Amino acid sequence: MEQGTVKWFNAEKGFGFIERENGDDVFVHFSAIQGDGFKSLDEGQAVTFDVEEGQRGPQAANVQKA
């Protein structure tokens, strides 16, 4: 798993971006967030995640709040 920081996340649209430790950004969809209840992330929040190849390039999977 990688570690990163939430760059931004739009809860209304259900997606955002995580900044990886290497400085690259990776797309995150709310469906990739682990846990119960409303799935959202806060700007600046530390997270761990896997990276999978999506239809439009790399995207975060198995996102967990650190």
Curated annotation (Swiss-Prot):
GO biological process: mRNA stabilization; regulation of gene expression
UniProt main location, coarse: cytoplasm
Domain of life, per lineage: Bacteria
Description of how the protein assembles with itself and partners: Homodimer.
Residues annotated as domain CSD: 4-63
This protein's name: Cold shock-like protein CspLA
InterPro entries (alphabetical): Cold_shock_CspA, Cold_shock_domain, CSD, CSD_CS, CSP_DNA-bd, NA-bd_OB-fold
Induction: In response to low temperature.
Organism lineage: Bacteria, Bacillati, Bacillota, Bacilli, Bacillales
SUPFAM superfamilies: Nucleic acid-binding proteins (SSF50249)
GO CC terms: cytoplasm
